[in-house]
Amino acid sequence: MKTLNELTLLDKFLFDEVMDIPEAHEAALRIILGDENLRLLTPSQTEKELRTAPWLRSIRLDVYSMDENLRIYNTEAQKTRKPDLPRRSRFYQSFMDSSLLKSGDESFNLLNDTFNIIITPFDLFGEGRYCYTFHARCDENPSLVLEDGATRIFLNTRGTNRNEISEELIQFLEYMEQSTLDVDI
């Protein structure tokens, strides 16, 4: 077991503790999304559990929040390489969506826009990117976007495409992995 001094922000305990501070989670989201105007409306909730029925699998979101534009964020740190992360993000997306509409809501346009963000110290897709952003697109016409309001972002702290993303995001991702007490800020 690691000591507290050996933990980085990719370790669940420290990630949850830091992101439980609304200003820290807001700052992280601003950097990740490149949106300086992003303001959280609700305090961040760590370890938010969503359940539907006792016999079905529930989920526990690392850090859940909503901004003043009513966009929903789930931010996860995933230190262990698991090949099912894309399907896990789909499962989390469906759970988040199922809790957003009330009985009797007639329009699915009432669904909030959602962002599932997973930060990893490995390249899940093997292309050397720091950031992989996914939206639903038409296979026959990739320029046709479904516009369903769902965004999934996979961040890799060990990317190599430095010229394609902001220096601030690169520094943030490097800090996520190297953030022990021995590292100067």
Regions found by a protein language model. Give the residues of each.
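Elongated, amphipathic alpha-helical interaction scaffolds
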Residues: 1-185
